[in-house]
Amino acid sequence: MKKLKASEIRQKYLDFFVEKGHMVEPSAPLVPIDDDTLLWINSGVATLKKYFDGRETPKKPRIVNSQKAIRTNDIENVGFTARHHTFFEMLGNFSIGDYFKQEAIEFAWEFLTSDKWMGMEPDKLYVTIHPEDMEAYNIWHKDIGLEESRIIRIEGNFWDIGEGPSGPNTEIFYDRGEAYGQDDPAEEMYPGGENERYLEVWNLVFSEFNHNKDHSYTPLPNKNIDTGMGLERMASVSQNVRTNYETDLFMPIMNEIEKVSGKQYLVNNEQDVAFKVIADHIRTIAFAISDGALPANEGRGYVLRRLLRRAVRFSQTLGINEPFMYKLVDIVADIMEPYYPNVKEKADFIKRVIKSEEERFHETLEDGLAILNELIKKAKATTNEINGKDAFKLYDTYGFPIELTEEIAVQAGLKVDMTTFESEMQQQRDRARQARQNSQSMQVQSEVLKNITSASTFVGYDTATAQTTLTHLIYNGEEVSQVEAGETVYFMLTETPFYAVSGGQVADTGIVYNDNFEIAVSEVTKAPNGQNLHKGAVQFGQVNVGATVSAEVNQNDRRDIQKNHSATHLLHAALKSVLGDHVNQAGSLVEADRLRFDFSHFGPMTNDEIDQVERLVNEEIWKGIDVNIQEMDIASAKEMGAMALFGEKYGDVVRVVNMAPFSIELCGGIHVRNTSEIGLFKIVSESGTGAGVRRIEALTGKAAFLYLEDIQEKFNTMKSQMKVKSDDQVIDKLTQLQDEEKALLKQLEQRDKEITSLKMGNIEDQVEEINGYKVLVTEVDVPNAKAIRSTMDDFKSKLQDTIIILASNVDDKVSMVATVPKSLTNNVKAGDLIKQMAPIVSGKGGGRPDMAQGGGTQPENISKSLSFIKDYIKNL
């Protein structure tokens, strides 16, 4: 067998199947586009669902890809096994109703055994098949010539995820020899068993049945092929190394970890776990961020945060106690650059994100340890066992490996309730598995739409009306020849001016009519074969297939949509100009009455930045720039500087919307002919939608004017109420009112202090001596939570060597504050005092050794909490 680099294996695979008439499908971003069922692209076939379910027809029925993927259902196994990964590449060849078992098996055998390709020794290959799949058996045995002893029948060789396509599969195994798997059970020592000797290198799925709702199976009219070969595993076989982590995909990362940690890989099993965790997770994190994901507290962002924190925790076992993961990004970029240049192109941005996350986690790590210490105290006082749910929360929220929790617990003479912990883990796995199965289920779209292939030409770029013919009617999921008034129907036209929802732009609305009927069009979408599919309600008459009709778009809405779409392009360019090139579109909505634009950026925009962006857009509007739209090949478009939206896929011919020099962008939407038609642009809000993603909402034209007019009316009302005549006087008057308010509040605060002081009497007389300390513990009557802190400041100035603890009832809520002279904080800590008191009033709190505060919801227990804290100090 040839010894090949991973990049060479990838290229050979693609080249082989191109020779066999396959179309290369580029690797899609890890963040799914137009697929809300997936958290991540998790397999090679995930990006091809649109072809398998009929939403789109591929240029060729034969497809090959090398798809990057993320799976996080087994995170806890990564690092402890030879081949578990969260990020991996899946090589795959696919047939959409073209070739089937014969060719799929022959292709696989040729690629693996031919000296031109992988050059594997045929006598080291074994296969598994489903017991009832005699067709696959005969191909392997009679056509390929594989001995019967190397064809293993396994009941589990059937790909089935519930309703939808399913079928038997055949897996190909490579025998690595007797040196491998010596510690594995003898009963598992066969291809398909749990062992290290026989490695599965390729899985061929023969999708030939439909799994029906009643659990029966019927043959599919079009049979498909779906195969998968893990690049990392094939590299380990080709390079003859024990695990995936010793291939050229990982070893440069391992070498860098060795330099930083001063530890060696493959010397100590416990240390090796940390090496593998770090190397795996940095690949996942770097690629996910390069594809638009960012750390967050939910969704895919939470997965990234959890992976990064897990890697940081394991790095500490190697003695690395400072941010360093970000330094590995350049190495990942260098390894993967030949096929994935995106990581290198965005390396600076990726490193900034990772470094920021690392710094934050090192800060919060102390909090996690503090929580664990509290759990230990709680366990010592009760069962001598840390609650499993608490341990799981520590693991899941703070990224603490359970091994670390157990280790610290053992040092404290405790156990961890692993039964409950494992139960929580299993529930999480079950949720992940269910989500994965749901996401993989391919819903076959209506065969009616899939079988309609007649052309429907969009003419709406040039006109909002058209004389055309109604060619197809779909009612209640069936194609019909006529529909009566009052019904909702889907239909197609030979030519249509109606834009179908796409690229963030909403669909046109309007009417389709003739003398006999009228349809009010409410939605337009793309059918599986690319036609515009209209939805509408029949207003009157009887609609018939073949009717000649007039199609008219609502032109007022169309004009407003055009303005908003062109303004969105200007906004995108302005954001890049003001904030930086890291800004990428993360979503958009272009409607008639407004526009919404989501983009990647670290934090909230300042008012000055918003003003700059708004002015830039308006300046381009007022320049009256002609909007030139051309169709050209993708290479020419990029050469002229056209901006392609991140994550979008484009065909060979693209449409360029040119507002040069400010904005040149690839876009299929409808636009104004000159920027002056937009009239006016006004940002009405800027907000966050998630970690690292901001959202701008804006108005144009008449809507922007009406918005400003409304603001002016409110401003005039305010002037009237303030009794000022000119606009300039408003700010002066407002400042005057604010100053007066501050003065009154200060007077009120002073009066509150005086009242409290009168009620308290001589506080020196209330100081007690407890356990050798001067202590003032009392309830105070104050009007608000701020006043208790002010009262504390007064008491501290008078009692500088005294421990002071105050509590108050403000609006049926407890406020507490404690101070300890700094000379005493080695023995008594204010934070501890509040933490002891707070639970008694059903609250919580904490703070520094010299000052702490807290609150609670049971003011009836204030006296009890004050008595308790006196006893607590007495027993220190």
From Swiss-Prot:
Subcellular location field: Cytoplasm
Signal peptide region: none
Any GO MF annotation of the entry: tRNA binding
Cofactor: Zn(2+)
CC cofactor note: Binds 1 zinc ion per subunit.
Gene3D superfamilies, per the entry: 2.40.30.130, 3.10.310.40, 3.30.54.20, Bira Bifunctional Protein, Domain 2, Threonyl-trna Synthetase, Chain A, domain 2
GO terms for biological process, alphabetical: alanyl-tRNA aminoacylation
Identification of the protein by name: Alanine--tRNA ligase
Keyword check for Ribosomal protein: no
Entry's family note: Belongs to the class-II aminoacyl-tRNA synthetase family.
InterPro entries: aa-tRNA-synth_II/BPL/LPL, Ala-tRNA-lgiase_IIc, Ala-tRNA-ligase_IIc_anticod-bd, Ala-tRNA-synth_IIc_core, Ala-tRNA-synth_IIc_N, Ala-tRNA_ligase, Ala_tRNA_ligase_euk/bac, DHHA1_dom
Entry EC number(s): 6.1.1.7
Originating organism: Staphylococcus aureus (strain bovine RF122 / ET3-1)
